[in-house]
């Protein structure tokens, strides 16, 4: 069953990413005016300078970088090698011509340029607060058992370090990875979500590097909005206006957790709600829908959407899921 949930997390990541791609980085008002309502895969509009490179049902840098991380984990048989993760991401960026397209976030671009110049990951500052670590962390949530919080945070920090080392970026990645890992263990969403603010607080305060607002407090605000809102549209509007749906970890991670709650953990519903939110739709979609997929397993993903993702992206997620499940079991036995 854990392999099915791991597969669900990987497909959830790709589903949320590809569904949210056409509207990414557009204001909510423009998403509504241009699309009306997104409820299926669409090509990136030529007017969207972040999405114009992508065809219908293609995922973006979020899932591509998650697979760079997964490849590094498989190559090292479940061990975390930050320099290999960094090289994999750089190789993908060069293949995709990501430096010349409006695809890389500012923190990742600076870090990858330094890696390209031969700097070891350990020497990079990488104190940015954008969401590049959280957006790609799902394979790590599949690998790491959610037992000892401190060692979990350390592992996530190590895997994030090629591009992001700040307290906030690491805490955001920890929240997403912890939720996925607990889901793979079969925990209920209500138990998982109640634990996330304290996990976020612990992760953010472990090594303070910024003067950021509290991720734990923002998670609580986002969840309160969803629980008190009068319907889905009102909840989405309030999340967008109050919490924010931007590329910063402090906005996008609380938004993603709140959208899992709003979608009642249904991965297909979650991907649609994220795509219509406005802002960093593909990244919020990738994070939130990965959690939903981990909660319910791959069979909860709409078979038609899954088939389209497979056909367009030439996916072999089964190979990743089998290997990650094996390496997770080895870690659980220690």
From Swiss-Prot:
Disulfide bonds: none annotated. The keyword Hydrolase applies. Its EC number is 3.2.2.-. It is an enzyme of class 3 (hydrolase). GO terms for molecular function: hydrolase activity. The keyword Hydrolase applies. InterPro entries: ADP-ribosylglycohydrolase, Ribosyl_crysJ1, Ribosyl_crysJ1_sf. Keywords: Hydrolase. Belongs to the ADP-ribosylglycohydrolase family. This is Uncharacterized protein YegU. It comes from Escherichia coli (strain K12). The lineage of its organism: Bacteria, Pseudomonadati, Pseudomonadota, Gammaproteobacteria, Enterobacterales. The gene is yegU.
């Amino acid at each position: 069953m854990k392999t099915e949930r791991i597969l669900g997390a990987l497909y959830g990541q790709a589903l949320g990413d590809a569904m949210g791609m056409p509207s990414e980085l557009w204001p909510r008002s423009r998403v509504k005016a241009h699309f009306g309502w997104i409820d299926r895969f669409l090509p990136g509009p030529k007017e969207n300078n972040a999405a114009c490179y992508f065809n219908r049902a293609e995922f973006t840098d979020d899932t591509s970088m998650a697979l760079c991380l997964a490849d590094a984990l498989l190559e090292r048989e479940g061990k975390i090698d930050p320099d290999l993760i960094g090289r994999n991401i750089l190789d993908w960026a060069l293949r995709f011509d990501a430096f010349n397209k409006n695809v890389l976030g500012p923190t990742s671009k600076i870090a990858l340029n330094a890696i390209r110049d031969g700097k070891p990951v350990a020497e990079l500052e990488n104190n940015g607060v954008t969401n590049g670590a959280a957006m790609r962390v799902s394979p790590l949530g599949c690998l790491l058992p959610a037992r000892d919080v401190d060692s979990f945070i350390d592992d996530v920090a190590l895997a994030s370090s090629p591009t992001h080392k700040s307290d906030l970026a690491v805490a955001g990645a920890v929240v997403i990875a912890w939720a996925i890992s607990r889901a793979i263990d079969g925990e209920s969403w209500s138990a998982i979500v109640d634990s996330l603010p304290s996990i976020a607080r612990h992760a953010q305060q472990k090594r303070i590097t910024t003067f950021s607002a509290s991720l734990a407090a923002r998670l609580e605000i986002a969840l309160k909005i969803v629980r008190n809102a009068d319907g889905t549209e009102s909840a989405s509007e309030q999340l967008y206006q109050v919490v924010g749906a931007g590329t910063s970890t402090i906005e996008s991670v609380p938004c993603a957790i709140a959208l899992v709650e709003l979608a009642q953990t249904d991965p297909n519903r979650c991907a649609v709600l994220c795509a219509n939110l406005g802002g960093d739709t593909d990244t919020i979609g990738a994070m939130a829908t990965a959690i939903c997929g981990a909660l319910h397993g791959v069979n909860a993903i709409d078979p038609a959407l899954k088939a389209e993702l497979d056909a367009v992206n030439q996916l072999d997620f089964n190979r990743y899921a089998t290997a990650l499940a094996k390496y997770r079991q080895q870690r659980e036995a220690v």
